[in-house]
A protein has these predicted regions:
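Active-site nucleotide/adenylate-binding loops and adjacent lid/helix of ATP-dependent enzymes
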Residues: 2-11, 73-76, 84-190
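Alpha-helical structural motif
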Residues: 17, 130-133, 196-199
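Phosphate-binding core of ATP-grasp and ATP-grasp-like enzymes
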Residues: 175-178, 184-218
Length: 218
């Protein structure tokens, strides 16, 4: 008898996609395959997770889950997205990489956090010039511009800025977040690309102004 292969999905506040994904898998009645929300009651080093595949929708916000997923991957679970890429998967690095391989991206600069990070003082930043060269930064990016965290997603802490005065006001509200200032691109078409295993690619139309469940045209 073939052992059942379990697909788990790890998620947070969202409900529409995770539950629809689980229902779509189970509705197919594929022999030996079942899908469910990931259940975690303990995480012991080197022990398997009990899942053959885990779809990750939340570990970018929860360090505990990132550690859990890395342990699961080491024990043979296929984790989507790759948990070992998390440290490199931030917007500024991705933009820098794109510039090196010839992919057009919006003009972007990274900004130090407005407030000092924990356990630091002014003496921690003797290599950083204050004030920054704001004139050059604003001339390079232009206005309108968007300011957003350099890592993470979910459209959190994103600001549209029309001038330097708005920038200074909003930047003062961002606390210890490291932010990007990015050129506005007024798009006529918007696409997202999903790649699995560095091999399978799906390009999909995407409308970010729609409700979440109506954004993709797959």
């Amino acid at each position: 008898m073939t052992a059942t292969k379990k697909i788990g999905i790890l998620f947070g506040k969202e409900r529409s996609f995770p539950m629809a994904f689980i229902e779509a898998i189970n509705r197919r009645n594929l022999p030996g395959i079942t899908a469910e929300p990931v259940r975690i009651d303990k995480v012991i080093q080197g022990e398997p997770s009990g899942y053959d595949v885990i779809i990750d929708r939340i570990s970018q916000d929860v360090p505990f889950y990132r550690a859990y997923l890395k342990n699961a991957a080491l024990r043979g679970t296929a984790v989507i997205n790759n948990p070992f890429w998390w440290s490199a998967d931030e917007k500024f690095f991705n933009n820098c990489l794109a510039t090196r391989i010839g992919v057009p991206v919006p003009k972007t600069v990274i900004l130090p956090s407005h407030d000092l990070p924990p356990d630091t003082s002014d003496q921690s930043f003797i290599n950083l010039t204050y004030p920054l060269d704001w004139d050059t930064i604003f001339h390079y990016v232009g206005f309108p511009a968007y300011m957003k965290p350099f890592a993470g997603g979910g459209w959190k802490n994103v600001y549209k800025l029309h001038n330097a005065e708005e920038f200074y006001q909003r930047h003062g509200e961002t606390g210890q977040l490291v932010m990007l200032l990015q050129e506005e691109i007024v798009f006529t078409e918007y696409y997202r690309c999903y790649c699995i295993g560095g091999k399978y690619v799906r390009i999909m139309s995407y409308e970010p102004r729609n409700p979440h469940h109506l954004r993709y045209e797959a």
